């Protein structure tokens, strides 16, 4: 299922404290209490007004799909396994249609969204190397489940369930039912 296997790499977070620990002590102290599959790599003092999510200069999401003839047993926890044949060139062509500023309401899973659904995607790259498909999304921000739905839509283009010609109509409809899984 495309909905599992979610991971964060080099995620930025922030918190406020009155503690007088060094950055190294903050890192080491937090790591003592975290499970082994979650690690603080670095800590630094910031301006009091800094907010990791609100001050982000951009966001990057990656979907990794194991599409090889034989499942990758070593990386399986970090990939979704899909065995269909995908037309990567069609997916790349469709991805170009998402670049720029658009109303991505069709790609949002929040029916009660009160804020603007207009977002800007600066780049989408799709690569297939040795049966591993990576889809990278870069933008100024993303809606609830937007990247997941965009990925599903691109995969449907890759299996020819949708065509590139469908993408402008899906964007225009502003309906979650119009987009991919």
Which stretches of residues belong to each language-model region?
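Structured-RNA-binding interfaces characteristic of tRNA pseudouridine synthases
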Residues: 4-181
């Amino acid at each position: 299922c495309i909905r599992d296997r979610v991971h964060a790499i080099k995620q930025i977070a922030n918190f406020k404290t009155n503690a007088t620990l060094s950055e190294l002590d903050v890192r080491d102290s937090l790591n003592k209490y975290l499970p082994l599959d979650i690690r603080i790599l670095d800590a630094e003092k910031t301006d009091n007004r800094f907010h990791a999510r609100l001050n982000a200069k951009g966001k990057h999401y990656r979907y990794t799909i194991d599409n090889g003839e034989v499942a990758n047993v070593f990386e399986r926890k970090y990939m979704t396994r899909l065995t269909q044949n995908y037309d990567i060139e069609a997916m790349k062509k469709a991805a170009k249609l998402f670049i720029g500023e658009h109303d991505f309401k069709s790609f949002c899973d929040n029916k009660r969204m009160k804020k603007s659904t207009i977002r800007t995607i600066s780049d989408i790259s799709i690569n297939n190397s040795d049966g591993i498909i990576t889809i990278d999304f870069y933008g100024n921000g993303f809606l609830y489940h937007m990247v997941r739905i965009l990925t599903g839509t691109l995969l449907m283009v890759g299996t020819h369930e949708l065509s590139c010609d469908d993408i402008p109509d899906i964007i225009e409809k502003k309906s979650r039912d119009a987009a991919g899984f």
